[in-house]
């Protein structure tokens, strides 16, 4: 099956009465993710062959390469939608996301400090 385009997703979302409050287009992010997954897989390939088999490993190598090439060169992309029931459900800018990430980083740092 094909990955749905943004317009195809929107035709399903719109009749639900949901409002799109944010869209993020992650252009080459998934290609990079697939590349890194493939590198990690290859570093552990011998172990994977022992657990599964050679056919399994070849299948995953092929999957990682084909998918990475598709996302890198064939205009495939991942997009994230933020949907809400109300237009004013989230702030007007993404600043609240940054503030949340900062608070989370501080909390994680404190947890590590006290765990040591």
Residue map of PLM features:
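Hydrophobic positions on the alpha-helical face of helix-turn-helix-like DNA-binding modules
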Residues: 92
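Substrate-binding/catalytic lobe of Class I Rossmann-like enzymes that use SAM or dcSAM, i.e.
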Residues: 1-89
């Amino acid at each position: 099956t094909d990955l749905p385009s943004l317009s195809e997703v929107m035709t399903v979302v719109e009749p639900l009465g949901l409002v799109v409050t944010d869209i993020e287009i992650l252009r080459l992010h998934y290609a990079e993710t697939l590349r890194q997954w493939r590198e990690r897989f290859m570093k552990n390939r011998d172990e994977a062959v022992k657990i599964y088999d050679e056919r399994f490993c070849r299948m995953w190598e092929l999957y990682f390469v084909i998918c990475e090439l598709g996302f890198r060169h064939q205009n495939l992309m991942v997009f994230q939608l933020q949907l809400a029931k109300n237009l004013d459900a989230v702030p007007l800018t993404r600043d609240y996301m940054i503030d949340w990430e900062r608070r989370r980083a501080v909390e994680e740092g404190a947890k590590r400090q006290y765990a040591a």
